[in-house]
Amino acid sequence: MANPPSRYDLTGRTALVTGAGGLLGKQHVAALAEAGARVVVTDLALTQAETAVAALKQAMPSADLNAVEINVTSLDSVRAASERLAGRGVTVDILVNNAAIDPKVTSAPGVMHSSRFEAFPVPQWQTEIAVGLTGAMLCAQVFGGAMASRGRGVILNIASDLGVIAPDQRIYRQPNVTREEEQPVKPVTYSVIKHGLIGLTKYLATYWADHGVRVNAISPGGVFNDQDPAFVERLTRLIPMGRMAELDEYRAAVQFLCSDASSYMTGQNLVMDGGRSVW
């Protein structure tokens, strides 16, 4: 029997992470690098990707990290990145679709009003879906399609607990706001996009099952990042474990889903939310 830890080893494989300059994006890169993968660190601007690489290199000086610019909303941009990598002899074995716009909940006048469903701007809807959902589809078309042609690969879509449940708008309420229509809310796009990613996961898992490509999703809960204490208190009341996630708590799950440790798993959504979605 193989030594179980070796099934998590990603040495010799190349992973590409979209939106890698963000809070969790850098954690996904670190997780893959820890497991031995070469990681292509991508973001909308090359400077963002390079900044992420520099920050990660301080903690992981031996990590094999390469910064690449990708606009995930543009098929031409995704194809160009794929061609640049191919020109360097780089084959992407693992795709992590992480790029997204996480609209912030705010009570600022004007911004608050436009975040409510009744007044939600169509251009904002289109922009956020283009990044978070269409972008995942385009990257899967290009990089996943190449995996299917080779007969091997892994795609991991980063969803959310809000792709399993709806946002509880009560946790965003402000006591000093008296008019209901002026209360801040979590905008509609985030939850819709994350639900869509889970659907895309199931579709691609069955579509490419006979081509050796596994496709799974992970739905993380909220990560503590020095948020407003009142908000944290309201949110943690909804979580059986009584706390938000630590920044690095999803690393092992990413390693599991991207490695041979999950070799008989596809089309699944791994929910890691401290129990919030089952309460």
For each predicted feature, which ranges?
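Canonical Rossmann dinucleotide-binding motif of NAD(H)/NADP(H)-dependent dehydrogenases/reductases
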Residues: 7-40, 204
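The beta1-alpha1 cofactor-binding region of Rossmann-like NAD(H)/NADP(H)-dependent oxidoreductases
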Residues: 46-47, 69-81, 122, 247-249
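Catalytic loop of short-chain dehydrogenase/reductase
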Residues: 116-122, 156-196, 201-210
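A conserved structural motif in NAD(P)-dependent oxidoreductases
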Residues: 239-250, 261
